[in-house]
A protein has these predicted regions:
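N-terminal entry segment of metal-dependent catalytic domains or homologous docking segments
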Residues: 1-65, 148, 197-208, 268-275
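PP2C/PPM family metal-dependent serine/threonine protein phosphatase catalytic domain
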Residues: 4-18, 103-123, 127, 152-213, ...
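Short beta-strand scaffold segments in enzyme catalytic cores
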Residues: 23-26, 128-135, 140-144, 149-154, ...
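Conserved catalytic motifs of the protein kinase core domain
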Residues: 31-33, 138-141, 215-217
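Short hydrophobic beta-strand that contains or immediately precedes a catalytic carboxylate
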Residues: 35-39, 143-145, 219-221
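Helix-loop-helix
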Residues: 58-101, 170, 238-261
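Flexible coil/linker segments and helix-coil junctions enriched in charged and small residues
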Residues: 94, 99-116, 165-170, 316-339, ...
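C-terminal catalytic subdomain
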Residues: 192-377
Length: 377
């Protein structure tokens, strides 16, 4: 089993001098493989959330190894786990707060505090989201409060004999890649549930399974990652590309350290964290299926853009013909329409060139994999 993680500060945080709000962890504790990501909310209200996210990592590490995760589908046991994580994080935030009081905070301490309200005021300062995934001897389990996405990549369930360069034998909508943790409508735009919520333990979502449903990989990504890709398909493709570099934890972490700052600059400009657990044996058996999955979606994208290209080309020709009519001579609105749709046509044509180049790369990868399999037979 391979575990790895990386966190990078967002380009907007670098530019403004704000601290990185994300924290992550991946590793093995006994017979438990664990990945964790937490994202502090930031802003004046959550002024210590960069610390809160790191404390969330510590809370999960301290609690989870003492819980039998085979009980994940028992509602009472599961709720106990979530409650203990929230309570542990709360204690850690209170300890940190009183160990690091500013002079202004000391001056504002009430003589006879309302304990419950004081705890609430403290935890809000450290507010953050939390995601964790575990692979244990009996199966796997993942849970989350707040935004970000957990993406699971699964083995193909049937052994198909794929002809060379023929991807049609793999059903496009087969659930090779899923977001198994249910979504939460309360996590929208800049709104999110949080460890600092009054009833945080009841706001966790989860998924899991036994050994027979073990994923090839479980990826956790903070919202800075998924907000950079625009579509779920693009996000899933990113994680499949990461899997192709999973020769070792060191190599893939090095690649993420190179890629994430560039992604932040071009995308969300937010902090970014990825943590993952990868079953290397399952990956070796399924990497060809994943490449074919990419080929299918690339072919679909090409077909959609070809149709769009044909539509725009026909529209531009029609508008240009219309512009030759005497009654439209010098019509500025018509010329603006022609210019606009011509720019759209250029964009689609450029996108098609990029997709065609990508399809060629993927076909080369599947051919190389096929040749490697033949050489080992």
């Amino acid at each position: 089993m391979l575990t790895f993680h990386h966190t990078c500060i967002g380009s907007s945080h670098l530019a403004s001098g704000r601290p990185c709000q994300d924290a992550s962890f991946a590793g093995t504790i006994g017979d438990l493989h664990l990945a964790i990501v937490s994202d502090g909310h930031g802003g004046a209200i959550h002024s210590r959330s960069d610390v809160g996210s790191q404390l969330a990592i510590y809370a999960v590490q301290g609690v989870i190894e003492n819980h039998p995760l085979s009980d994940w589908d028992n509602a009472d046991k599961r709720q106990e786990l979530f409650q203990e994580i929230v309570e542990s994080w709360t204690v850690l935030t209170i300890d940190h707060y009183y160990d690091n009081l500013t002079e202004q905070e000391i001056a504002q301490l009430p003589l006879f505090p309302d304990v419950e309200q004081s705890i609430r005021n403290i935890t809000v300062l450290y507010g953050c989201t939390l995601m964790a995934a575990c692979v244990h001897p009996d199966g796997w389990f993942a849970f989350q409060i707040g935004d970000g996405k957990c993406v699971t990549i699964h083995p193909l369930q049937t052994d198909l004999d794929f002809p060379e360069n023929n991807s049609k034998f793999l059903i496009p909508n087969s659930k090779l890649v899923t977001e198994a943790i249910p979504t939460d409508d309360r996590c929208f735009l800049h709104m999110t549930t949080s460890l600092c919520d009054p009833n945080a333990a009841t706001e966790f979502r989860f998924c899991g399974g036994n050994k027979d449903t073990m994923p090839v990989a479980i990826f956790l990504g903070s919202d800075g990652i998924d907000n950079s890709w625009g579509t779920d398909e693009a996000l899933h493709n990113f994680y499949i590309e990461v899997l192709k570099h999973c020769t070792s934890a060191e190599n893939v972490t090095h690649d993420l350290a190179d890629a994430l700052p560039q992604l932040s600059q071009a995308g969300s400009q937010d902090d970014m964290s990825v943590a993952a657990i990868v079953d290397k044996d399952l990956l070796a058996k399924n990497i060809a299926h994943l490449i074919r999955y990419q080929i299918i979606h690339c072919e679909q994208d090409i077909n959609e853009r070809v149709q769009r290209q044909e539509h725009l080309a026909s529209l531009v020709i029609s508008l240009k013909q219309q512009a030759t009519l005497p009654e439209y001579e010098g019509n500025e609105n018509l010329q603006r329409d022609i210019d606009y749709h011509y720019r759209q046509l250029e964009e689609v044509t450029n996108a098609l060139e990029r997709l065609s180049a990508r399809l060629s790369r993927l076909q080369s990868q599947i051919h190389a994999h096929h040749q490697s399999d033949l050489s080992h037979q």
